[in-house]
Swiss-Prot record:
Keywords: Cytoplasm, NAD, NADP, Oxidoreductase
Residues passing through the membrane, by range: none
Organism: Catharanthus roseus (Madagascar periwinkle)
Pfam families listed in its UniProt record: PRISE
Active site: K146, Y178
Enzyme Commission code: 1.3.1.122
Principal subcellular localization: cytoplasm
Name recorded for this polypeptide: (S)-8-oxocitronellyl enol synthase
PANTHER family linked to this entry: 3-OXO-DELTA(4,5)-STEROID 5-BETA-REDUCTASE, NAD-DEPENDENT EPIMERASE_DEHYDRATASE DOMAIN-CONTAINING PROTEIN
One Gene Ontology molecular-function label: identical protein binding
Length: 388
């Protein structure tokens, strides 16, 4: 089955209407519940699960998110359910009737990184689905490589593991809601005879204007504002981050990785890293970003005072409103479509490389070219009219 995982970038971009023939709906082999479907990986799952050659398919897909269904997601073949999963009664009311679910893909979190709230959200999902979906087989939990260096709120108080990160490294002795989610997963799947998988993606390159940590969207907005104001694209990060190697993962590849673990017996009950299988440097990404927007690039300058991207963009709300109106873009607010604080963290980080050896040894051979993935995400932002 490993041939399927070698697909090209953007494979889910143009979905055929593969689930209908002569107006009659096909039967489904598997039914997915994607929690966090408007997020960066959730939206990719919504596309990749519906491809005609996706293993385990044909798939029916329920998509859950807190906000109303956005226009760009409404065009996807997903049964959308607006639900605040932090509310137990609302979650039970809306999800317990879904008795045909076979696989849960949990790719959601709350931005405060609060352990109790994130744990409650996950528990509410499992408590609503497991007792009612008699055909449930697998629960996929997505966390991330913060498992190896701590959550953002702990900052410099944490001594991270040495990279490259491998899945067998012990938990750091600091609060991390990933630990709470894993413990809940192990307990609930164990007592209900379900299989599970935990996925730890690297920095994700993908499309979703609703994501709290979308580096590509953030950089696209920054570059768009620079072009609008006829300013150079200045790198706001550290010297080390400018020069060191980094890794990332295409959101579609994360989706493929999670589907693989959900259907391939070799990958069941495993903790798995996920990245593109190559490395890049921000200095090269920065050059490509400037080229894509047709603006001058200014990289790291030795001795120059470093100004954070959040500081550079703090008064640009009205500028962004002008850009949206001038170019007839999908209406968005700056705080919705860009996370400058997150870019600042990425541009001050170094040596956060994870190993894909375990997944390869188990049979997952998927990969992406990180530079091409980055450009593809820019193209998608333009296709959906979020940037000019």
């Amino acid at each position: 089955m490993s041939w399927w995982w070698k697909r090209s970038i953007g494979a889910g971009k143009n979905l055929p209407n593969q689930n209908k023939e002569n107006g009659v709906c096909k039967s489904y082999k598997s039914v997915a519940l994607v929690v966090g479907v408007t997020g960066i990986v959730g939206s990719s799952l919504a596309e990749v699960l519906k491809l005609p050659d996706t293993p385990g398919g044909p798939w029916k897909v329920y998509g859950v998110a807190r906000r109303p269904c956005p226009v760009w997601l409404a065009k996807k073949p997903v049964e959308y359910i607006q639900c605040d999963v932090s509310d137990n009664q609302e979650t039970i009311s809306k999800l317990s009737p879904l008795k045909d679910i076979t696989h849960i893909f949990y790719v959601s979190w709350i931005g405060s990184e609060d352990c109790q709230t994130n744990a409650t959200m996950f528990k509410n999902i499992l408590n609503s689905v497991i007792p009612n979906a008699s055909n449930l087989q697998h629960v996929c939990l997505q966390t991330g490589i913060k498992h190896y260096f701590g959550i953002f709120e702990e900052g410099s108080k944490v001594v991270p593991h040495d990279s490259p990160f491998t899945e067998d490294l012990p938990r750091l002795n600091v609060p991390n809601f990933y630990h709470d989610l894993e413990d809940i997963l192990y307990e609930e799947t164990g007592k209900n005879n379900l299989t599970w998988s935990v996925h730890r993606p690297a920095l994700v390159f993908g499309f979703s204007p609703c994501s709290m940590m979308n580096i590509v969207s953030t950089l696209c907005v920054y570059a768009t504002i620079c072009k609008h104001e006829n300013k150079a694209l200045v790198y706001p990060g550290s010297k080390n981050s400018w020069n060191c190697y980094a890794d990332a993962v295409d959101a579609d590849l994360v989706a493929e990785h999670e589907i693989w673990a959900a259907v391939d017996p070799k990958a069941k009950n495993q903790v798995l890293n996920c990245n593109n299988g190559d490395v890049f440097k921000w200095k090269h990404i920065w050059k490509k970003l400037a080229e894509e927007f047709g603006i001058e690039m200014v990289g790291y300058v030795e001795g120059k005072e470093q100004v954070s991207l959040a500081e550079l963009m703090k008064d640009k709300d009205q500028v962004w409103d002008e850009i949206v109106k001038k170019n007839n873009l999908v209406p968005t607010k700056l705080k919705e479509i860009a996370a400058f604080w997150f870019a600042d963290i990425a541009f001050c980080s170094e040596n956060l490389i994870s190993s894909m050896n375990k997944s390869k040894e188990l049979g997952f051979l998927g990969f992406r070219n990180s530079m091409k993935s980055f450009v593809s995400c820019i193209d998608k932002m333009r296709d959906y009219r979020f940037i000019p």
